[in-house]
């Protein structure tokens, strides 16, 4: 429902004020001088929530991402994967319907990345949030998605939209299944179609 008399900037500003979406960056972007619970609670402070409601939401989201008991730690006291989970908790804290994630696991080693992929799927099942996840990893895209939008580089355009019929319950070994590999090949073909090497 967009008011055509207003510019898109006004629409985006309204969405920001209404907290229509949460955003998770490539790097955790945690403030070093704030504890994890104060980092997670920052958007709630900005929104003007009461101390009681803020504490409840922070505790709930830290528990949701598996960081219960780490709220009083500082970012430097956590591993890279734990810092990224704190960043996800911060994005979830104000209860937006849409979570935008820009390569949040790109800098992590493969084992930690696999673990966070499993946790993100579980988080999605628990919350029902819409998650838009940007990645350059074909296996990660196929594992996490029920819809994959394949894009070309410069200029960015959609080369394919793939509806995944993988089951909602996805153990890591699903990546060895024929269905998974077929979807991954279709993603690869879409990427290849969008690239020019001339």
Regions found by a protein language model. Name each.
Residues 88:
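Hydrophobic anchor residue at the start of the ABC signature
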Residues 34-41:
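Short coil-to-helix segment of the ABC ATPase nucleotide-binding domain corresponding to the Q-loop/switch region
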Residues 99-102:
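Catalytic Walker B motif of ABC-type/P-loop ATPase nucleotide-binding domains
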Residues 26-31, 137:
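Catalytic "switch" loops of ABC-type ATPases
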Residues 1-12:
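Single conserved hydrophobic/aromatic residue that forms the stacking wall/gate
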Residues 73-76, 94:
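Conserved signature/switch motifs of ABC ATPase nucleotide-binding domains
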Residues 41, 45, 52-70, 122:
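Conserved ABC ATPase "signature" region
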